[in-house]
């Protein structure tokens, strides 16, 4: 949760923002952090994936002039760190800290350098400006809004803004908002978005296979245990098979060291006897994952719908 262009008392706003963040604490139960000054407030609820020990947010630069709150993962953070190791002093092992380094070097012109899924808010205290951005296709959710005092808000879930903002919008994927420009700008554009540009493209199966493997492999970056949700369908089966292929080694060391959790765990959820569960078990047996089947009854499913609806509103 973030608030910018503050016009109300910062300490009163701080309490309000903490209550807003509490509404979405289920998104990040591992750490709660807040930054507050007279112009901006950033509150973060963290789910630890990379660098659980020192990656608490909001992240700050060494001079504490740049403050960053990120929801997401930056898959090419090791490459960026290596490129900038002589230009920026990193304080944590967090994959997201590279955003601070890139901003310090390039200003707002760095979004194309990032390979990942993300929604972030970066406040530049020295220049009293801020940058909000969202990943190319909107994997990570983000909303924005304004209250009656024209204060600008962002949040990972709509319910954090409900009752506070009198105007709320979805922050569009592939866009950024820079406070000095005061309008949304599209930063992600590709020629293949127009059919005319790709209608005659030949498909290279080997190239497609390599791209898919690389996409799955880079997302195995983790300092905590992970698993795959396996339905037995084509998509989840292919992704699970690729994940199993690389699960025994640590991606972070370019497969040079053994993974901390070398066995891939797969999970399937459904009604007992459902055909999806049977298919998932067949795939799990074939690829050799440690498989977990979780069953629920129709009544349990109906009961869960009420609980989920209430959680969305709370």
Task: Please provide the spans of the model-predicted regions.
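N-terminal segments that mediate ammonia production and transfer
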Residues: 2, 7, 15-20, 26, ...
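AMP-dependent adenylate-forming
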Residues: 32, 52, 143-144
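An anion-binding catalytic pocket shared by soluble metabolic enzymes
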Residues: 50, 55-58
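Residue-level signal for inorganic ion chemistry
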Residues: 28, 72, 99, 177, ...
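Conserved glycosyltransferase catalytic-site signature
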Residues: 95-96, 115-117, 277
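ATP-dependent adenylate-handling active sites, centered on carboxylate activation for C-N bond formation
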Residues: 5-15, 86, 125-131, 136-142, ...
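Glycine-centered helix-coil hinge/cap
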Residues: 85, 104-108
